[in-house]
Amino acid sequence: MSDFQKSFSESTSSIKFDEKYIDNSVQPNDIGVAEQWAVKTVADPCVGNLATPVNSGYFTKAFINNLPFYREGISPNFRGLETGAAFGYLLYGPFTMTGPLRNSEFALTAGLLAAIGAVHILTALLVLYNAPGKAPNVQPPDATVNNPPKDLFTRAGWADFTSGFWLGGCGGSVFAWLLVGTLHLDTIMPIIKNIWTAG
């Protein structure tokens, strides 16, 4: 013990706590609500990866592990195909309903082209992530994903994911365009367009 530590220890040993502020109902061995919900480290505490009730809860783990990016037993190409189809399908609606041509007769086609353009931009970003230099970052196991896909985080796996994402994104946009173009939605489309242009 250094001289500073000794002097500090001696100076603080005379400190007395006021008895009215001491809570005797809490004992060191009690396991209360705070202990049950305490945040624990997953692996190395210096990394800052913590197991909280949110990221290590049953619902969160089941939801995240069933997404196509983390689901076990599928190829990187199919992961990209499924992820891209969801992106393309979901991007079509906002581009069609809130785009600059929403009140014209070309709204459906403009939404399709805008969604496909957004899928192309996202695909270009995925290609840049796999650009020469550093290999894609391999995610270590954590509190939410116990077994991340190892075949995805290689150059070939990421390239397969990217090509599947492009194909799925374009296909999802075209599928949404075909669904909106059906006859039974012709009566609903003017109502939806009037909601967005009411302001």
UniProtKB/Swiss-Prot annotation:
SUPFAM superfamilies: Photosystem I reaction center subunit XI, PsaL
Family membership: Belongs to the PsaL family.
InterPro entries noted in UniProt: PSI_PsaL, PSI_PsaL_sf, PSI_suXI
Gene Ontology terms: biological process: photosynthesis
UniProt GO cellular component terms: photosystem I reaction center; plasma membrane-derived thylakoid membrane
Species of the source: Prochlorococcus marinus (strain AS9601)
Record carries keyword Transmembrane helix: yes
Membrane topology of this protein: Multi-pass membrane protein
Transmembrane segments: 108-128, 165-185
Phylogenetic classification of the source organism: Bacteria, Bacillati, Cyanobacteriota, Cyanophyceae, Synechococcales
Superkingdom of source: Bacteria
Keywords: Membrane, Photosynthesis, Photosystem I, Thylakoid, Transmembrane, Transmembrane helix
HAMAP family with a match to the protein in the record: PSI_PsaL
UniProt cross-references to Pfam families, sorted A to Z: PsaL (PF02605)
Signal sequence interval, chain numbering: none
Gene from which this protein is expressed: psaL
Subcellular location, record wording: Cellular thylakoid membrane
Name the UniProt record assigns to this protein: Photosystem I reaction center subunit XI
